[in-house]
């Protein structure tokens, strides 16, 4: 059985460090604030946003909430974005996705002030990441990819020269994690697999590290991985469990793979807590840039 990479423990340590940094900021007259824009009442989104504000309270970051009804128009959402852009109490913020049908998510993201882009997903910030493959970056980084890399670092997993197979090309991680993995400081070699990739499983069998972000429960099987590989499970599927009569969250990696792996992230309890921690880290870093 491989080493279980505990995202909850690493996230807790990260938040403890951030709480100290927030105290130093307050001592110098800077109060960080995280804003959220929530449109509608999707249970998953409501729960996720509530978790973010609970994290804020834990480390001393102020919460700024903007809630709109399910039938909100594009202009109403855009107005909420502009309000947070102009609000000096808001250090950074996120627009909780998905937005209701009929609202262009990309157009809304484009309206976010890049300096307040807590998710690190604004085109300007992604462009900075593309341009600067070396040295420090003074713009927010995508939370989930950053969380993956910080989680592996916490377990002293060196990715230099490693073959990394990324499954899925979604913007949250699939298309963005390669930008971080191929930076000089990480130095991994990345293969991005998607629905058009021929013989995906052959790519998986060659990989030292698999980052699974497809949203297909149990897609990665033991026969698809080599002995001693590292498995990072970012996929989220809700699967009905007949025993409990409830839906449960399942990852992309079949748990039988853990026997062959050198290390693995459980799902839930692996990358998810780190994504939330990296959101806080982005906000604290934004505040520190004001010094």
Label each region the model flagged.
Residues 106-119, 123-130, 235-290:
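Rossmann-fold NAD(P)-binding glycine/threonine-rich loop
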Residues 31-40:
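Short beta-strand segments enriched in small/hydrophobic residues
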Residues 76-88:
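Short, well-structured alpha-helical segments in soluble
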Residues 1-30:
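Positively charged, low-complexity intrinsically disordered leader regions
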